Amino acid sequence: MKPYGLVLFNLIKLNVLRLFRCRKLRVAHVELLGHQMCFRLKRNATVSLGERLVSDGHGTILVDENAELQIGNRVYFNEDLMISVKNSVTIGEGCRFGPGVKIFDNDHVFDAENGVSDRHVSAPITIGNHCWIAANVVILKGTQI
């Protein structure tokens, strides 16, 4: 039996995000998101969440201005997920993610003389359909699976 209170809470949370923060948020029927799932969406972000999305436990999804996140149908995220999007992340249908997975389509600019900069470089990430990503995997900018 589904925890219907949590499903209702997620519907309210996602609709408030769409109304006040991210007008380009498209949500199909989300199955279950952990109550500690945190969405930080900038105003011009484009986010599409597919049908039957399930996320256990806590996680964080950050989508910057003019960035795009697409998550297909029947995707499962285990706990301690982190997705940071400054360009584009696309996740296909039927994907499964183990605990502790991190997805970053961006990185700080770094050089030996000046160290770490506040600037970022980014490149799209594409994860195809029916992929299984094991525990504690880190997926970086420009990756195609």
Regions found by a protein language model. Give the residues of each.
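Domain-scale signature associated with acetyltransferase and cell-envelope carbohydrate enzymes
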Residues: 1-104, 125-130, 136-139
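Extracellular/periplasm-exposed beta-strand and loop segments of Gram-negative cell-envelope proteins
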Residues: 107-108
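A short acidic, helix-capping loop that chelates divalent metal ions and anchors anionic groups
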Residues: 112-114
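Short beta-to-alpha loop/turn elements within the nucleotide-binding domains of ABC transporters
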Residues: 142-143
